[in-house]
Amino acid sequence: MLKIFLLTLLMISYTTIADEGMWEPYQMEGLKKELRATGYKKNISNVSDLFKHPMNAIVSLGGCSAAFVSDQGLIATNYHCIERSYLQFNSNAENNLFETGFVARSKEEEKKSAPGSRVYVTLESNEITEQVLMGVKDETADIERAKIIEENIKQIINKCETTDEIECRVRSFYSGETYKLEKVLKIKDVRLVYAPPAYIGEYGGEIDNWMYPRHTGDFALLRAYVSKDGSSEEFNKDNVPYSSDSFLKISSRGVDDGDFVMIVGYPGRTNRLLTFNEIKYDLEFQFHEVVKFLKRGIDLINEHSIDEDGSKLKYRGLKSGYENYYKKISGQINGAKNFKLLESEKENWNNFLRFVDKEASSEDKQYLEELLKLIGKEQLESRSRSY
């Protein structure tokens, strides 16, 4: 299951030191020393409690992070996050918002989003590992284990989703070691307020994408609406702006050298705990297959998209997504090669194996051996299902 949790990327700009990685809010209390050393001076609870300001101002668009920036439902997010559901949906040959950009000078001018566009506000997050694994025993076969877990999750979600505006998700962390139940409010009426033209929002294109430094106006503004009684409803002219529990204030001062910077959001996943075998598999096989698949998709769109029938505009968002991921994976392959990543990871892995051989119990050694066998089996099956 996709591992999704709150990202906190801690960076300090006055030196070359950067403490980075994905951290859940509850882990912040254990990082007090590191936070203080990097310049964080406020109360740790400000970044450890998901349901207090400023953390509860952060929301998800179901694939992108965003934040409330006013008490009138105004949301700041990235330009690339609104290309398909907002710009492409509201564009045509005569009114191409990619070329002109868009600004609503009043709430009445704001544009509705494509069907299915949502803002997700987290209401609760609780660990439910015991409930998910209820009925699973050490001797339970893998297929039976999966069936039990699937049925338990269905029952948990059915019990949690009491109304249409509530969505509940069970998230798996650390490959099934921990499970959490997220209860979110689905805001169904989301409108476009502002987006720059593409020459600002996509400045540098795929040449600058994933590169540093980058100078792109990759931002946009949306607004969330609910019915007058506060319930979440689809687009309706009588809906009113959603009033969030808190919102972020945008500083006009900017940042100076030495300022503490923290990024908070809802990312996809982290793969920092992969074994050497998994890293090697990705870099020597899986990533190359993904690149070939994406390149084929980009070529097909270019081949069959022509201005006359408006297909270029219709497929612009999809093509942009393909190109973005293509650049990312290609860059990871080249970066790993340039920095001799496999060589260094092999050395780290050998050091780990020597430690295991010397310090681990026979039971732990057996667990590691079984894990590596399962990884090898999974990789063989993955090759057979390759793109």
Set out the residue ranges of the language-model regions.
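Terminal presequence/propeptide segments associated with secretion/organelle targeting
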Residues: T15-Y387
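Sec-dependent N-terminal signal peptides
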Residues: I4-S13
